[in-house]
Amino acid sequence: MKVNNPFIITSKYVSKEYFCDREKESAELVGNIRNWRNTVLVSQRRMGKSGLIGHVFSTPEISKEYETFFIDIYDTTSLDDFVLLLGKEICERLQSRGEKLVEKFLMTVSSVVASFSADPISGMPSIDLKPSATSSAGKSLEQIFKFLESSSRPCVVAIDEFQQIADYRDGKKIIATLRKLVQNCQNTCFIFAGSNRRMMGQLFNTPSEPFFMSCTPLYLDAIALDKYTDFVSGHFKNNGKKIEKKCIETVYTLFDGHTWYMQYVFNRIFEATDAGQTANLQSIETAISNIFDIFEHVFQEMLLRVSEKQKALLIAVAKENKVKNITGAQFISSYNLKTASAIQGALRPLIENETITKEVDCYRITNRFFSLWIAKRY
């Protein structure tokens, strides 16, 4: 598939041509699947989890031997949402292989009702699932697992933002039920992906939790600078354009190798660079200035939603980029933040709503563009 801009910023996997590196992680994930090791995949949001999963699912050793299913449950709030999302994904994936497989699914999962229609834009057939009047989400989940286990080909199910289940009503009970179903599977392998390191760690590394030590961990860090440099310069060259190496290094450093933010900037730089031209450091300034203009009202509204104490803390964190000792005397005095207890009070809700992320050794504003915008404006 040929695209106009090689720097993809959607989470949907396109092809290996537009996928950078991750050779080691891909090999590990393929090995886990082929050797029936369930995987817990953890990284920051927008670091490339779904892209990695899509890439692995497209490899010949997986695509030719396995049925693969992927759902992102970030927007789900209940087991009903989860079940219908998984059921819809299975139906849509099976559609391309014939009506009989879809019919088999609907016969096995009798607790859901399907309606069929044509997509008004693409004209492709679309499936909508709803729970039957007498069904329960728990029963539907059991029936879906039964269907997966009866498949003629082994199945792989990837669930992104898995930690969301912990926030469901009766989340602990649902997680325990899932663990019981998963451990009894002989024909289905699972990838549990998540971006909240603390919650994923609690679910999979705490002895009292059902999923404790049940999966092989895989952590997704930044792509190496040399690999990403080759990726960026290669796409510019293939399209009759050039880019200075220093330009790539600067963007990489600015975002600490965080994939999506780099991709977004280079998407803009690529668009602004005509064939025969060379992108340089000025290209970065122009691209980021344009990004600030686009998100100006969004960022202003985000600041309006926080208290004055929270705003002061956000400004301080943005100025530092990342803060190791957020309640330390030096940080407090540098930005006139009053007391450590006041910081803790302001920090707690910002972490809960994911405005600030607590990493292994520091705190930082989750949205890197928001952080840069604050640092420049204040």
How would you describe each model-predicted region?
Residues D128-N196, N205:
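Conserved Walker B catalytic segment
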Residues D75, T216-K227:
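Conserved AAA+ ATPase "SRH/arginine-finger" region at the nucleotide-binding site
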Residues R197-C215:
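Short regulatory helix/loop adjacent to the ATP-binding pocket of P-loop NTPases
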Residues M1-Q44, T357:
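A short, basic N-terminal segment
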Residues V42-M47, G51-V156:
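P-loop NTPase nucleotide-binding core
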Residues S233-H297, E308, V360:
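Amphipathic alpha-helical "lid/sensor" segments that cap RecA-like P-loop NTPase cores
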Residues K2-P6, K246, D293, H297-Y378:
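C-terminal leucine-rich, beta-strand-based interaction scaffolds used for sensing/assembly
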